[in-house]
A protein has these predicted regions:
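Terminal accessory carbohydrate-recognition/targeting modules of carbohydrate-active enzymes
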Residues: 1-128
């Protein structure tokens, strides 16, 4: 499967698929130890009493900020009336993955939204 977003610094590499799920985490040797074993890490929200994982229902715009290696993703769920704006990067010097997330309500109402990140690591090929 092709990767829609690739972020790395030569030692630490994170790849995202078409649904904005992390599919690969390589560290400290890119191409040798994939700490996900190719299994997706899910990303979703809890709103209005239910959890919604990012899937085919969400509209997705996945790309890079112009002239950078910073990922820029917009996720929209029309039925929920939510838009998520995400910026992702791997630091060039420190092996750190950073994510900035902005939640926008498209209905014009104040609502309580929780963000869920489901990470299922396989460190060095071991089910952790």
């Amino acid at each position: 499967m092709a990767r829609s977003l690739v972020l790395g610094n030569g030692r630490f590499l994170i790849n995202f698929d078409d649904f904005y799920r992390i599919r690969d985490v390589y560290y400290p040797h890119i191409g040798i130890e994939n700490h996900t074993e190719g299994r997706p890490f899910r990303f979703g929200v809890w709103v209005d009493g239910a959890t919604h994982w990012v899937d085919e229902v969400w509209e997705r715009e996945i790309g890079y900020e112009e002239g950078t290696l910073v990922g820029r993703t917009v996720l929209r769920h029309r039925a929920l009336g939510l838009e998520l704006r995400c910026r992702d990067a791997v630091d060039f010097e420190a092996d750190i993955f950073c994510r900035e997330l902005e939640v926008r309500d498209l209905r014009g109402a104040a609502r309580h939204v929780k963000v869920f990140l489901h990470h299922d690591f396989y460190i060095s090929g071991s089910d952790v």
